[in-house]
């Protein structure tokens, strides 16, 4: 069978994506995609004169003057999801969208060259993925059945950038506030392994301090995974974020654990990034969403 005929994904640049928004009257999508907002006008006649329309007709994305039905259905999931799971992936240090370039034009929609971004959006039972790499966005249907399937997608994305084995460390839970304070002073010393005394006093082993220092100071690759739920016009983020860091000492996973009833203290898990523990991290992110069961929650 012709492989081209079996493909369902579409790839457009940021301008092409904005044209799809205009054709479907979609104001905005997940901010991580860094797309331009669309403001409705009285007439869309100008769209037919845009050179991008000819390209999208050639690709079958636009048929006559309407967006292909499958593409339109996916775009509508991205426009008004019940839930979004976001993964920011980077070769080297994750910059969280900050581009240090004084020549960057105001209002730029660029993302850092070393990053790519994945948004998994669900509306009802329809899951859609939008992946931004450089100036291009690829949109497709995606199968998500449980936290393990999301963890597998994240790990596949990270492996496409860089391979690392799980760090040879033991999993440990530490108080979040203490860890943040200790890491702040440790960072000032350049994550010198001999300056990690505060971490050692929290029960973190010397091997973990060494591997963590390498991953924090000079990561070969990083991922941050978090989620959002929507309810009417409100949105609520997950309380936990999963962070994966590849250092010379291997791949480490860090995530804030779900708070137990009656506990006022937040705890941070630091562990080797095995597939099983990455899945636990993803599940924790989803379990700390504010509006209930992530698989079935509806925004209305």
Swiss-Prot record:
In which compartments does the protein localize?
Answer: Cytoplasm
Q: What happens when the gene is disrupted?
A: Deletion does not affect EsxN and PPE41 secretion.
Q: Which UniProt keywords apply?
A: Chaperone, Cytoplasm
Establish whether keyword Methyltransferase is in the entry: no
GO cellular component terms, alphabetically, are: cytoplasm; peptidoglycan-based cell wall; plasma membrane
Chief site of localization: cytoplasm
What exactly does this protein do? Specific chaperone for cognate PE/PPE proteins. Plays an important role in preventing aggregation of PE/PPE dimers.
Give the family per the record.
Belongs to the EspG family.
Give the multimer and partner information.
Answer: Interacts specifically with ESX-5-dependent PE/PPE proteins. Forms a 1:1:1 heterotrimeric complex with the PE25/PPE41 dimer, via PPE41. Binding of EspG5 does not cause conformational changes in the PE25/PPE41 dimer. Forms a 1:1:1 heterotrimeric complex with the PE8/PPE15 dimer, via PPE15.
* Name listed for the protein in its UniProt record: ESX-5 secretion-associated protein EspG5
Q: Which organism is it from?
A: Mycobacterium tuberculosis (strain ATCC 25618 / H37Rv)
**Gene, per the UniProt record:** espG5
